[in-house]
Each structure stands twice: as structure tokens, then as C-alpha cells.
């Protein structure tokens, strides 16, 4: 797939911008602070309804405006799609597909697929577990747009369950036993929580299995192959310890093979685990088990990548993760034109010459590649293509 037109209204620094794009390589050259990253950020938002730079939508709306508008004309296999997202300051965001009536913004997820490489990707290796969980969830959302609804439902149930546990914490501090009403209510929320948690865990485990061989292959191609990149999903179900026979049975037997467990089996695991740690959860006032507390452990050779990888190795691991997600999306047979758009935002300036050349060679064959760079010398020769200058007066072709 590729984007042939991108239009912005009141997005970031742009009051208005209209940009024609081509298949193949498109390179945006401009000094820092002039808005080249804003252009690819808009494309990323059109694909994922999120920004790689900020967690809230507010900064995306130009100062003084009430809303921002992103429009894109997408060619996907034999289809041509007109996509539009309206980012609002004071009401829910909306979207349009082929200029039809407005729909929930979530309805456009999965139509445009992008894989974005950015300096922030170092947090995939060096950052907290939430960054790696989000990496899996973002890929799942691209592969299966309905996953966004599952994740939203899980977060809603988690919030409700935490509120209930906090209300019970006061009774615990005063040494009062939980009331019958609390126990009956928490059991209902346990069931809701376990159902959603099991589906979320199962989806993450499956997509990680798809990623593992691609991660390893990409890392070998980026480096001299002296170390092996590995990944392991550590579920909070793996490690909970309790005296009950049921809990011990789960910990010692099936938790080691969660990948092959059914959603129904995982649901039962969660219910038993929640029952086993209920008193601790009441004392803490929060949910101690669930996908929101899981970790994806990255290994490099015999050591964890986090804390042990050098700066260059950290970059190679981060690039391998992004390349692996590209390969998984490209191999998806569910849609026509699955090849995602690759976006490399100020990445080459961060890499040594060897990694620059290898990465450029690996992405050059994609259907569309968008690159941002401060100067021409930052762009490897392997990525020859259209040059677009971004300056204080606008966006123009070379």
C-alpha cells in the first residue's frame, strides 16, 4: 500500500498543508523544528489513532484551533480509499471513509498500515515494560483492528475492579472482614476481568510467536551475527505463589506452556490466581495480576538486552523489533496490499555507517518509504528517491 496524498488542517505547526506522495522512497529534508516530523506523525495518526511523540491528542491541534484534520488518499492493492480523521479538543474524535457520514474514529483502524522507526524506539529496549507491551498491542491492532476494542474493554474493567478494591481497602485497614456485598460484587468483576485478560494474553502470546523468528533474522542481518536476539513473554500468571493446591498446580504445570493454552483455560487460570491473591489486592487497593503487569523480556546472547546491551546493540535490537513487525504485517494474507508504509523519522542520524547501510538495504524494496532527515548526508545512498524540502516557507519538491 502507499499514500498518494496527505492533507493537514490545523495539525501541529501546519495551518494548511497539501502534499502529493509517490510509491517508493520519499525523503523530507529540513532543519529541526520546521515540521518534517509533523508530516509523518500525521500519517502515523491516520494509521493508528496515536502519536509516537505524545500520549494525549491536545498537542496535535494547532495552538488556538478547536480541531485538527488529517486527510489521506490511500492506494491499497486494487482499492483506493479516502481516509479522514478529525481530532477534537472538546468532543470525541471522528473519522470518515470515502467521504461518507462520520463514524467512530476507531472504524478506520487497520485500513492504513505503517511501521515507524524513530529515536524513541530505544525505549523498546531500555524503557519500562509498558513500552514493550504497547509494541505488541500496536502490532495486534494493525493486524486485527477489533483488538483495539478488546484492549479498551480490558482497561475499563481493570479501572472498575481497582476502584472496588480501593473501596475495600478502608475496611481492611480497620480490620473489618470484607462484606458479603463486596465478595459477591468482586466475583462478578473477577469473571469479567478474567475473560478479557485471557483474550488479551492469548493474542499477545500468538503475535510474539510470529515475531520471534523475524526478530532473530532481522538482528542477524543488521549485525555480524555474533549474538542471538531472543524474546520471552513473562506473564504475571507465571510467578504468583500461594499455598493453595490449585495455585501450585497452575504455577508448576500449565503456566510454562501458556502459548498453547486455550482462552477458556487461561480464564480459569486467572480466576484461580485472583482468588489466591485477593487479600493482598485488598491491602494494596489494586489488581496485582493481569496483562497490564506482564513483561516481554528481550535477550541478547546469554544476557538481558535491557541494562547489558551497548548503545549500538540497543539500536540494533530496536530496529530488529520494528523490522520484524514489518515482516509480520507484510506476510498477512487477510487483506489485499498488506505491505505497510515504512516511516523512518530522523533515524539515520543516530546510526553508525554500517547500520545505516544495512537498514537502508533492508527497507529499500518496500512499496513506500518515507524518510525524514536534517541534511542530505544523513540519508544513505541506497535510499535514492524523491527529495522534498521542508522550510519555514513551506514544503516543496527539489
Swiss-Prot record:
Can you tell me which residues bind ATP?
A: 30-37
An example Gene Ontology CC term for this record:
cytoplasm
Keywords, A to Z, come to: ATP-binding, Cytoplasm, DNA damage, DNA repair, DNA replication, DNA-binding, Nucleotide-binding, SOS response
What InterPro entries does UniProt report for this protein, alphabetically? Answer: DNA-binding_RecF, DNA-binding_RecF_CS, P-loop_NTPase, RecF/RecN/SMC_N, RecF_2
Q: Which Pfam families match?
A: SMC_N (PF02463)
| Molecular-function annotations in GO | ATP binding; single-stranded DNA binding
Function according to Swiss-Prot or TrEMBL: The RecF protein is involved in DNA metabolism; it is required for DNA replication and normal SOS inducibility. RecF binds preferentially to single-stranded, linear DNA. It also seems to bind ATP.
Task: Report the principal subcellular site.
Answer: cytoplasm
The UniProt entry's sequence similarity note says: Belongs to the RecF family.
Localization of this protein: Cytoplasm
Instruction: Tell me which Gene Ontology terms the entry assigns under biological process.
Output: DNA replication; DNA synthesis involved in DNA repair; double-strand break repair; SOS response
This protein's name: DNA replication and repair protein RecF
Amino acid at each position: 500500500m502507499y499514500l498518494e496524498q496527505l492533507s493537514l488542517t490545523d495539525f501541529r505547526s501546519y495551518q494548511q498543508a497539501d502534499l502529493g506522495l509517490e510509491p517508493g522512497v520519499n525523503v523530507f529534508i529540513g532543519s529541526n523544528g520546521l515540521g518534517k516530523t509533523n508530516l509523518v506523525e500525521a500519517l502515523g495518526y491516520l494509521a493508528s489513532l496515536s502519536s509516537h511523540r505524545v500520549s494525549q491528542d491536545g498537542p496535535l491541534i494547532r495552538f488556538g484551533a478547536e480541531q485538527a484534520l488529517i486527510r489521506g488518499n490511500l492506494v491499497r492493492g486494487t482499492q483506493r480509499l479516502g481516509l479522514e480523521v478529525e481530532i477534537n479538543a472538546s468532543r470525541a474524535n471522528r473519522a470518515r471513509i470515502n467521504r461518507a457520514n462520520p463514524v467512530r474514529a476507531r472504524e478506520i483502524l487497520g485500513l492504513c498500515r505503517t511501521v515507524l522507526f524513530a529515536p524513541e524506539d530505544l525505549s523498546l529496549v531500555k524503557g519500562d515494560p509498558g513500552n514493550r507491551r504497547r509494541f505488541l498491542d500496536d502490532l495486534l491492532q494493525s493486524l486485527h483492528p477489533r483488538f483495539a476494542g478488546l484492549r479498551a474493554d480490558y482497561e475499563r474493567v481493570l479501572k472498575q475492579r481497582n476502584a472496588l478494591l480501593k473501596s475495600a481497602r478502608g475496611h481492611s485497614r480497620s480490620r473489618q472482614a470484607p462484606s458479603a456485598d463486596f465478595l459477591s460484587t468482586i466475583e462478578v468483576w473477577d469473571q469479567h476481568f478474567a475473560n478479557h485478560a485471557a483474550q488479551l494474553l492469548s493474542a499477545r502470546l500468538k503475535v510474539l510467536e510470529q515475531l520471534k523468528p523475524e526478530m532473530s533474522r532481522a538482528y542477524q542481518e543488521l549485525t555480524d551475527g555474533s549474538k542471538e536476539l531472543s524474546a520471552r513473554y513473562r506473564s504475571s500468571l507465571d510467578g504468583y505463589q500461594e499455598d493453595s493446591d490449585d495455585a501450585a498446580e497452575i504455577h508448576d504445570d500449565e503456566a510454562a506452556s501458556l502459548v498453547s493454552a486455550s482462552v477458556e483455560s487461561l480464564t480459569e487460570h486467572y480466576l484461580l490466581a485472583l482468588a489466591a491473591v485477593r487479600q493482598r489486592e485488598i491491602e494494596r487497593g489494586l489488581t496485582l495480576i493481569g496483562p497490564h503487569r506482564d513483561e516481554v523480556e528481550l535477550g541478547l546472547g546469554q544476557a538481558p538486552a535491557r541494562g547489558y546491551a551497548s548503545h549500538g546493540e540497543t539500536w540494533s535490537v530496536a530496529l530488529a523489533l520494528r523490522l520484524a513487525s514489518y515482516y509480520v504485517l507484510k506476510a498477512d494474507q487477510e487483506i489485499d496490499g498488506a505491505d505497510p508504509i515504512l516511516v523512518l523519522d530522523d533515524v539515520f542520524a543516530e546510526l553508525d555507517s554500517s547500520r545505516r547501510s544495512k537498514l537502508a538495504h533492508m527497507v529499500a524494496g518496500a512499496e513506500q518509504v518515507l524518510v525524514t532527515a536534517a541534511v542530505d548526508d544523513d540519508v544513505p545512498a541506497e535510499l535514492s528517491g524523491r527529495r522534498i524540502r521542508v522550510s519555514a516557507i513551506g514544503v516543496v519538491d527539489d
